[in-house]
C-alpha cells in the first residue's frame, strides 16, 4: 500500500471530513442522562462493551464484509443487513446520514463512484476501490469511532483532556482484538448483545433536553 493510500484514509476518517460525526453520540448521551455512564471508569466500560458486543464490533465486521465483496448485489445485501441491524431509528439515521455524506464527498473529490451506503459499508467499499489495506482501515475506523465517543464524553461528563486520551489509549488492546475478529469473520458472525447501549439509543429519541442527534 502506498503512502498516498494511507493519507487518503487519514483524510476520510479525520474529524474535518464532512460526515457530521461530531453530532452523534451512539446513545452515549442517553446513557449519561440515565446515570449508566457517570465518569471516566464507566465510560471505559461502555466503550469496551461496544467493542466486544456492540456497535463498534458490528461496524468493523460490516466494513470488512463490504471490503471483501466482489459484486454490487452482495454489497447491497450487506448494506441492507447493516440497516436492518440498527436497533433504533436514531442509530439508523446515524449510519445512514454519515454514510451518504461520506459517499457524496468521496465521489466529488476522487471521482469514485459510490452508491449511497451506510457508513461502515461505504468506508469498506471505498477502501477496496482505492487499494487501502483492510487491516489499517479497520484499525483507523475503530479509532475514529472511539475518538468521537470520547470527545462526546468530554462534553457530557467531567472528563479532562488528559484523562480522555488515557481512556482512549486504554482501548487499544480490545480494539486490536475486534479488528482481528473482523478480519477472520463473515456476515454470519454478526451479532449484537450490548443491550444497555441499544436501549439508551431508543430512549434518547424522546429525551427532553439533548445536544446530540443520537
UniProtKB/Swiss-Prot annotation:
Disulfide bonds: none
Record Pfam families: UreF
Gene3D superfamilies xrefs: Urease accessory protein UreF
Database matches in InterPro entries: UreF, UreF_sf
GO cellular component term, pick one: cytoplasm
Cellular localisation: Cytoplasm
Molecular function, one GO term: nickel cation binding
Keywords in alphabetical order: Chaperone, Cytoplasm, Nickel insertion
Protein family (similarity comment): Belongs to the UreF family.
Stated role: Required for maturation of urease via the functional incorporation of the urease nickel metallocenter.
Oligomeric and partner information: UreD, UreF and UreG form a complex that acts as a GTP-hydrolysis-dependent molecular chaperone, activating the urease apoprotein by helping to assemble the nickel containing metallocenter of UreC. The UreE protein probably delivers the nickel.
Matches recorded under PANTHER family: UREASE ACCESSORY PROTEIN F
Name listed for the protein in its UniProt record: Urease accessory protein UreF
Gene name for this UniProt entry: ureF
